[in-house]
């Protein structure tokens, strides 16, 4: 879905408003703790941790909170939770496939909150494997466009396993296999190009076109899911035309 605005990405990101700011902070802090536990507490040797800290700073999370989360994760301070990654699958209104990624210390609470949000907003949970076959885990690395051309970026990452370079407005998005994320990052740094972000994402192989009303229903469901502290990301297979995007942006 290259070239579309954030509304049309397979992963719907909620807007940062005051009502949801606290929840967003909590999720960013959790990600830092988990990244430090998984790959060590040194950001210079742990790209995932480095990315998570940058995201938190960009969202104006206080430095003290960031540092405490890093120390909890690395074991320098006590108090870290036993986080579990859980992926729920299901369908939203109009047959839209949904993957709901949770990071939780309470499996029962996460399941209850996800099920409640789905049921109240026209969705239903499915069995494991019911929709995940429609999605592929993809590595995504982004860089600020600045003075760079698409060819500049492509030449830097071509030998590092990059599959595509897409123009997404102010950013270039590079897709690759998840196992090649580090190689792509290293190639960009070697070429003097600063990495904005990198993550493992889910991209749909089959997309469902929606009109504006259908899109609004999905976004309402996604917002309800992301109201749960346990829900980290929601991936869908929606496809929105430029006309629908224009209508949504005028809401």
From Swiss-Prot:
- Keyword check for DNA-binding: yes
Where in the cell does this protein reside?
Answer: Cytoplasm
Keyword annotations = Cytoplasm, DNA-binding, Transcription, Transcription regulation
Q: What is its main location?
A: cytoplasm
What would be an example GO MF term here? DNA binding
Q: Positions of the region Disordered?
A: 1-22
**Could you tell me the superkingdom of the organism this chain comes from?**
Bacteria
Which SUPFAM superfamilies would you find in this protein's record? YebC-like
GO biological process, any: regulation of DNA-templated transcription
One family name in Pfam for this protein = TACO1_YebC_N
User: Which Gene Ontology terms of cellular component type are present?
Assistant: cytosol
The UniProt entry, under PANTHER family, shows: TRANSCRIPTIONAL REGULATORY PROTEIN YEBC-RELATED, TRANSLATIONAL ACTIVATOR OF CYTOCHROME C OXIDASE 1
> What family does the database annotate?
Belongs to the TACO1 family.
Question: What name goes with this protein?
Answer: Probable transcriptional regulatory protein cgR_1708
Q: Which organism is it from?
A: Corynebacterium glutamicum (strain R)
